Design a protein with these regions (language model features):
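Ligand-binding clefts of soluble mixed alpha/beta catalytic domains
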Residues: 1-172
């Protein structure tokens, strides 16, 4: 059984209550695929937008924060399932205050004192890995699981190479 919380809001995230072997659990998972006319803060600026599943945006961070708070209120343990490439970046993302929303979510997770479990299916990248129940940002995490294909990193290789060598390549 699964009862979704705020369907349609923050469509990159699926949140809801599930019964697993008779035990009620809060489930948070990210959606893979294209998200038409989303995120809303890019729609307001450009009149069109296309979000990418696996990336976190404003509404999804707000939705997760509210859901963690509700689970904490009712002492419902949580299961996090992630396959993420990170939190949206750029000027629009900064104006949408994504960093602050991520910090608020980590605070909610830490103060909830709920038992949690996290599963990384393919990728757990950067701050998105932490806010999706990753053990680095979660003292309540009982354990984390991965698959043979799981990659967890602070920054993907291409981004790291660009950050390290862009200035040097421009000089040469």
């Amino acid at each position: 059984e699964f009862m979704e919380y705020k369907h349609g809001y923050g469509p990159e995230m699926i949140t809801g209550l599930a019964k697993i072997d008779g035990l009620l659990v809060g489930v948070v998972a990210n959606y893979q695929g294209m998200l038409m006319n989303y995120p809303e803060y890019k729609m307001a600026t450009y009149g069109q937008a296309m979000g990418v599943g696996g990336k976190l945006y404003r509404q999804g961070l707000i939705k997760m924060n509210e859901f963690v708070t509700l689970c904490a209120r009712d002492r419902i343990p949580m299961l996090w399932v992630q396959d993420t490439t990170g939190i949206d970046v750029g000027n629009d993302a900064e104006r949408a205050e994504l960093l602050g929303l991520g910090q608020s979510l980590i605070y909610s997770i830490q103060s909830s004192k709920l038992p949690m479990m996290e599963i990384t299916l393919r990728r757990g990248t950067a701050a998105a890995h932490y806010v999706l129940g990753g053990p680095q940002g979660n003292d309540n995490n009982a354990f984390s699981l991965g698959t043979a294909a799981t990659e967890i990193n602070v920054m993907n290789g291409k981004t790291a190479a660009n950050a390290m060598y862009t200035g040097r390549l421009a000089k040469d």
